[in-house]
């Protein structure tokens, strides 16, 4: 971000400006022509590497422009543009691959079968990206394009191997440090806010700084601070932008003082841009709360600092309960996160020797879910046909269900839907699977799973963060934990609605509870756009749905299957509007008008009290 601030309202971004800034440049046709014309294998390898690297450079240049555009949209309070930028960014990688693949197939069809050309060309590419920061990302792009052309199996290529190797990443390169003594004063916080360099005015920076300093002082109390004790505040040299909000992220460090070891306190300063200026909306100092704010259930952040390895490492240090791979994904680097997640799953198996077995909870009617006991992830496939317990008259088929999982990946998940990593043509060792699971996969997933000697090959494989299914959680939780979970279930349903997502199968078994006790929707075979659903008022004929598209809010509690009367009452008392047609119709009108409903990304208790 810039280091200066203006006192004028930012100019909205024009449609043509966004179009120009996010347009992918055409492939280098001169290089393509030279590639098509040469018969020399060495020249073909060299030119293929140059063509692909040129396409990657085009992609990477656009992807790095988008965070600055997101900052400009935040400063201009142009919320529809923030949503549009997220959609553009998430589809950019695939669009660039898809732009080049047909040209290579048409001009050099032997690429799909020539087994000698690819290794030689790969060596040329690795030599060309030697020393570049984004070398691993360029190599990921290369592998994605190769799989599209060759229809090869997906494998977690080690992008940190060979000539793309890098030293162990430290977040120090992306941190700005302020050294002071306790107590942390309003003036120190005001300096940090001012150094963020927004180009729009603050409503009351000094007042917000005083409130933030007070919140930080309260959060430090369990660490036994002493007046005058040295303290270091490290803030990422990056703005994080998403939808209506922005945040500054870092940590507070108290040194080892003999009787106390070094102490670290995560820090997130959440910002809003209101009509009368920037405000500090909340201060988060708990790792679990940061994890919720940076959850993969939300839209990705646009981070203005290009050093994605250091940013991901910083986020991992602040939120160690979340695997490193998901830290890449939450700042928009899905393809690096995809590799990291599969590498973590394989490493978990090597370390624990555990086998993949059916996931705890109820048997899925559409999906087969499986996991290892100590793994952080759940893997899924879609059945060829639903089980006999399937609720609806018509099953759209495997490809349509996968389309819905992809849809959820590509939208703002509003803090209440798990992201999906979807792999194609993945091969996993047969020994990783428990015999009962192996039999079920091969019997119920004939169109998806095949046995290839000592391995299972998956046409598709969905990976999600592991949750505890809501009914299983309620069966083992305390009364207070259960009450909090059903209230959070209502928040989840509201947030889904704000993202134009309606789950027509409102069974509580489709929702789960995370390690930080947040409730999320995780099964997507029954999701529909809320704007396409007909909301029925009281007096309609009985039955939850008509042809799967008519929703009767007054029947919501029956659909959720919350059997405990006290929990049903807690849900109804906390969210009475969810049982009323007016609420749902109002949300539909807002979505159709292009409005961006507000979504709460952190506990209301962390908002500054003015």
From Swiss-Prot:
<keyword id="KW-0904">Protein phosphatase</keyword>
<keyword id="KW-0418">Kinase</keyword>
<dbReference type="Pfam" id="PF20423">
    <property type="entry name" value="AceK_regulatory"/>
</dbReference>
<keyword id="KW-0329">Glyoxylate bypass</keyword>
<feature type="binding site">
    <location>
        <begin position="359"/>
        <end position="365"/>
    </location>
    <ligand>
        <name>ATP</name>
    </ligand>
</feature>
<dbReference type="InterPro" id="IPR010452">
    <property type="entry name" value="Isocitrate_DH_AceK"/>
</dbReference>
<dbReference type="GO" id="GO:0006097">
    <property type="term" value="P:glyoxylate cycle"/>
</dbReference>
<keyword id="KW-0963">Cytoplasm</keyword>
<dbReference type="GO" id="GO:0016208">
    <property type="term" value="F:AMP binding"/>
</dbReference>
<dbReference type="Pfam" id="PF06315">
    <property type="entry name" value="AceK_kinase"/>
</dbReference>
<protein>
    <recommendedName>
        <fullName>Isocitrate dehydrogenase kinase/phosphatase</fullName>
        <ecNumber>2.7.11.5</ecNumber>
        <ecNumber>3.1.3.-</ecNumber>
    </recommendedName>
</protein>
<dbReference type="GO" id="GO:0006006">
    <property type="term" value="P:glucose metabolic process"/>
</dbReference>
<feature type="active site">
    <location>
        <position position="419"/>
    </location>
</feature>
<keyword id="KW-0067">ATP-binding</keyword>
<dbReference type="GO" id="GO:0008772">
    <property type="term" value="F:[isocitrate dehydrogenase (NADP+)] kinase activity"/>
</dbReference>
<dbReference type="GO" id="GO:0004721">
    <property type="term" value="F:phosphoprotein phosphatase activity"/>
</dbReference>
<dbReference type="GO" id="GO:0004674">
    <property type="term" value="F:protein serine/threonine kinase activity"/>
</dbReference>
<dbReference type="InterPro" id="IPR046855">
    <property type="entry name" value="AceK_kinase"/>
</dbReference>
<keyword id="KW-0723">Serine/threonine-protein kinase</keyword>
<feature type="binding site">
    <location>
        <position position="380"/>
    </location>
    <ligand>
        <name>ATP</name>
    </ligand>
</feature>
<dbReference type="InterPro" id="IPR046854">
    <property type="entry name" value="AceK_regulatory"/>
</dbReference>
<dbReference type="GO" id="GO:0005524">
    <property type="term" value="F:ATP binding"/>
</dbReference>
<keyword id="KW-0378">Hydrolase</keyword>
<dbReference type="GO" id="GO:0006099">
    <property type="term" value="P:tricarboxylic acid cycle"/>
</dbReference>
<keyword id="KW-0547">Nucleotide-binding</keyword>
<keyword id="KW-0816">Tricarboxylic acid cycle</keyword>
<keyword id="KW-0808">Transferase</keyword>
<dbReference type="GO" id="GO:0005737">
    <property type="term" value="C:cytoplasm"/>
</dbReference>
<comment type="similarity">
    <text>Belongs to the AceK family.</text>
</comment>
<comment type="function">
    <text>Bifunctional enzyme which can phosphorylate or dephosphorylate isocitrate dehydrogenase (IDH) on a specific serine residue. This is a regulatory mechanism which enables bacteria to bypass the Krebs cycle via the glyoxylate shunt in response to the source of carbon. When bacteria are grown on glucose, IDH is fully active and unphosphorylated, but when grown on acetate or ethanol, the activity of IDH declines drastically concomitant with its phosphorylation.</text>
</comment>
């Amino acid at each position: 971000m810039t280091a200066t601030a203006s006192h004028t309202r930012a100019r909205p971004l024009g449609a043509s400006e966004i179009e120009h800034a996010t347009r992918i440049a055409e492939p280098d046709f001169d290089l393509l022509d030279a590639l098509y014309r040469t018969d020399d294998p060495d020249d073909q390898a060299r030119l293929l590497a140059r063509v692909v690297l040129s396409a990657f450079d085009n992609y990477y240049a656009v992807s790095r422009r988008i965070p600055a555009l997101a900052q400009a949209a935040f400063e201009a309070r142009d919320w529809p543009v923030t949503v549009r930028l997220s959609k553009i960014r998430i589809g950019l990688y695939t669009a660039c691959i898809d732009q080049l693949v047909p040209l290579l197939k048409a001009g050099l069809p032997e690429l799909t079968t020539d087994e000698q050309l690819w290794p030689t060309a790969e060596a040329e590419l690795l030599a060309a990206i030697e020393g570049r920061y984004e070398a691993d990302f360029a190599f990921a792009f290369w592998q994605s394009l190769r799989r599209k052309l060759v229809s090869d199996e997906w494998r977690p290529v080690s992008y940190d191997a060979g000539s793309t190797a890098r030293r162990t990443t430290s977040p120090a390169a992306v941190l700005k440090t302020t050294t002071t003594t306790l107590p942390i004063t309003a003036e120190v916080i005001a300096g940090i806010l001012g150094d963020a360099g927004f180009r729009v005015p603050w409503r009351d920076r000094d007042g917000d700084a005083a409130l933030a300093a007070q919140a930080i002082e309260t959060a430090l109390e369990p660490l036994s601070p002493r007046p005058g004790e040295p303290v270091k505040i490290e803030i990422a040299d990056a703005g994080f932008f998403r939808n209506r909000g922005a945040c500054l992220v870092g940590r507070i460090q108290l040194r080892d003082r003999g009787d106390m070891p070094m102490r670290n306190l995560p820090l997130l300063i959440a910002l809003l841009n209101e009509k009368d200026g920037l405000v500090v909306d909340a201060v988060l100092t708990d790792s679990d709360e940061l994890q919720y704010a940076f959850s993969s259930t939300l839209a990705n952040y646009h981070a203005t600092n290009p050093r994605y390895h250091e940013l991901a490492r910083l986020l991992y240090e602040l939120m160690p309960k979340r695997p490193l791979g998901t830290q890449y994904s939450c700042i928009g680097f899905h393809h690096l996160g995809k590799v990291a997640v599969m590498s973590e799953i394989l490493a978990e198996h090597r370390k624990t020797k555990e086998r993949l077995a059916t996931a705890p909870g109820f048997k899925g009617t559409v999906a087969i879910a499986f996991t290892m006991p100590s793994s952080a992830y759940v893997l899924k496939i879609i059945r060829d046909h639903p089980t006999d317990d399937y609720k609806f008259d018509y099953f759209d088929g495997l490809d349509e269900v996968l389309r819905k999982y992809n849809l959820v990946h590509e939208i703002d998940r509003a803090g209440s839907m798990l992201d999906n990593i979807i792999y194609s043509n993945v091969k996993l060792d047969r020994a990783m699977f428990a015999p009962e699971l192996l039999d079920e996969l091969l019997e119920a997933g004939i169109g998806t799973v095949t046995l290839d000697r000592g391995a299972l090959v998956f046409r598709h494989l969905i990976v999600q963060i592991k949750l505890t299914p809501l009914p299983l959680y309620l069966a083992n939780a305390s009364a207070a934990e259960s009450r909090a979970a059903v209230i959070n279930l209502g928040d989840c349903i509201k947030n889904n609605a704000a993202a134009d997502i309606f789950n027509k199968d409102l069974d509580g078994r489709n929702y789960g509870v995370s390690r930080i006790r947040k409730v999320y929707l995780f099964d997507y075979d029954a999701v529909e756009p809320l704007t396409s659903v007909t909301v029925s008022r009281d007096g309609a004929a009985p039955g939850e749905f008509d042809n799967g598209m008519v929703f009767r809010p007054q029947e919501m509690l029956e659909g959720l299957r919350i059997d405990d009367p006290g929990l049903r009452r807690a849900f109804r008392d906390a969210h009475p509007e969810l049982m009323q047609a007016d609420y749902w119709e109002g949300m539909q009108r807002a979505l159709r008008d292009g409005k961006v409903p507000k979504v709460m990304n952190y506990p209301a208790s962390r908002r500054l009290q003015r």
